[in-house]
Amino acid sequence: MRKVNCIKVITRAHTLGYCGGVRMAVRMAEHARAHHRGSVYTLGPLVHNPVTLARLRARGIECLDPAHLSFALHAPAAPGAAPHAVEEKTARTVVIRAHGVAPEVYEALERSGAQVVDATCPRVKESQRRAQGFAAQGLHVILAGDRNHGEIVGIEGYVRAGAAQACSHLPGGAPDGMLPQVQCFVVQNAREAAALPCLARAALLAQTTITQGEYDAIAAAARTRVRELTVARTICAATARRQAALRALAPTVEALLVIGGAHSANTQRLLHTARETSLPTWLVERVEDIPPDIYAFSAVGISAGASTPDCVIAAVEQALRTGGAPVASRVSSSALPKVSTCRAVCAAATSSVGSAGASGAVSPGAVRPFAVGSVR
C-alpha cells in the first residue's frame, strides 16, 4: 500500500532540464524528419534519455547501431532493384548526435552519399577544435572523462587528426609509415591521472559534463606527471549551473529527486552532487520510477539532467503533488531503441574508411605513438 502523501512543498532547482545543445539537437532531428525524404537515423542515441529516444522513434527517427552502420555508409542499389527500393536506400539522412563523432566517421558518412545533419553541441565542437589544435602543435592530449562516452570517443578522433597535421609540419613531411609522437590518454579520475607516464608537454581537456571538483582533482594529479601542462576550460557552463542550483536547493528541502536517463553522464554527475548533500536522494527516468518512500517527506526538491525533456519533469512534479502516475506520461521500455557503444560505432566507421594514415582504427586501451589510449 502506498504511504500517505505527506509532501507539502515541491521545489524545482533554479536551473534544470534541457540545455541549449540538447534542445537544438532534438529540434534538428525533428526538422530533418519533417523535411527530408526517405529514412532518418541518428548515429547512436541522439541524447541519453529513454523518454526522448522513444518519442523520436515514434516520429519515425531511428537510432542507427553498428550492425546497421554499413548500410548507412554503403547502400548501392541491387541489380534490377525496383525504383522505390533504390529510393528507400539512397534517400537517407543521418543526424550526428549532440555528443559529436570523430572526423573520419563524419567523412565516411558524407562519402556514402547520405545527407548529414550535424547536431553536435557547440560546446563539444569547441572541445574538438581545441584538442585538434593542441595535437597539431605536438602536445600530448589528456582527456578527463568516461573513456566509453561518445563525446570522448569523438574528441579522440580529432586528436588523431591533429597528430596528422603535426606530421605535415615535419621537414620534408613524415617518412612513410612514421607518425608523430603525439599520444592521447583518457583518465577517469585523479588516481588514473597520477599513473600517467612522465610527459614534457601536454594539454588537459575535460568532458563537458564532468564536475569542476573532479576536473580540479585530475588536473592536480596530472601536474605531478607533466612538466608543462596546459589546462583547458571545457566544462559546459550549463552543467555547472545545474549542479550549483541543486546545491542551493538542498538546504531548503528534506529529500531530492533527480530526473534523467540512467545512462546520461550529466545526470549521473547531478546525482553524485545530490548525494554529496547527504539528503535522501533518488534517480528516476519517468513517473513510474518514483519511489513510494519519497511521499513520507514534507519538502522535496527536484532537479533534472540536461537531456531530460520538460514534459517528463512536469509529469513527475504532478505525480508528486497528487500521489499518482498520469497514464499519459507512460512510455513502454519495449519502445526504446537499441543503444550501442560509442566505440563500436566509431570502429565500424573507421574500418570502412581504411587503415591508412590518421584514419586507422585504434584498439581501445592501447597507448603508443599517435595512438589513442587509456590509462588503466
Curated annotation (Swiss-Prot):
Dimethylallyl diphosphate binds at residues 48, 99, 149, 264, 266, 307. Pathway: Isoprenoid biosynthesis; dimethylallyl diphosphate biosynthesis; dimethylallyl diphosphate from (2E)-4-hydroxy-3-methylbutenyl diphosphate: step 1/1; Isoprenoid biosynthesis; isopentenyl diphosphate biosynthesis via DXP pathway; isopentenyl diphosphate from 1-deoxy-D-xylulose 5-phosphate: step 6/6. (2E)-4-hydroxy-3-methylbut-2-enyl diphosphate binds at residues 48, 99, 149, 208, 264, 266, 307. Its cofactor is [4Fe-4S] cluster. Binds 1 [4Fe-4S] cluster per subunit. GO terms for molecular function: 4 iron, 4 sulfur cluster binding; 4-hydroxy-3-methylbut-2-enyl diphosphate reductase activity; metal ion binding. The active site is at 151 (proton donor). One of its GO terms (biological process) is dimethylallyl diphosphate biosynthetic process. It catalyses: isopentenyl diphosphate + 2 oxidized [2Fe-2S]-[ferredoxin] + H2O = (2E)-4-hydroxy-3-methylbut-2-enyl diphosphate + 2 reduced [2Fe-2S]-[ferredoxin] + 2 H(+); dimethylallyl diphosphate + 2 oxidized [2Fe-2S]-[ferredoxin] + H2O = (2E)-4-hydroxy-3-methylbut-2-enyl diphosphate + 2 reduced [2Fe-2S]-[ferredoxin] + 2 H(+). It comes from the Bacteria. The keyword Metal-binding applies. Isopentenyl diphosphate binds at residues 48, 99, 149, 264, 266, 307. Keywords: 4Fe-4S, Iron, Iron-sulfur, Isoprene biosynthesis, Metal-binding, Oxidoreductase. The keyword Iron-sulfur applies. [4Fe-4S] cluster binds at residues 19, 121, 236. Catalyzes the conversion of 1-hydroxy-2-methyl-2-(E)-butenyl 4-diphosphate (HMBPP) into a mixture of isopentenyl diphosphate (IPP) and dimethylallyl diphosphate (DMAPP). Acts in the terminal step of the DOXP/MEP pathway for isoprenoid precursor biosynthesis. This is 4-hydroxy-3-methylbut-2-enyl diphosphate reductase. The lineage of its organism: Bacteria, Pseudomonadati, Spirochaetota, Spirochaetia, Spirochaetales.
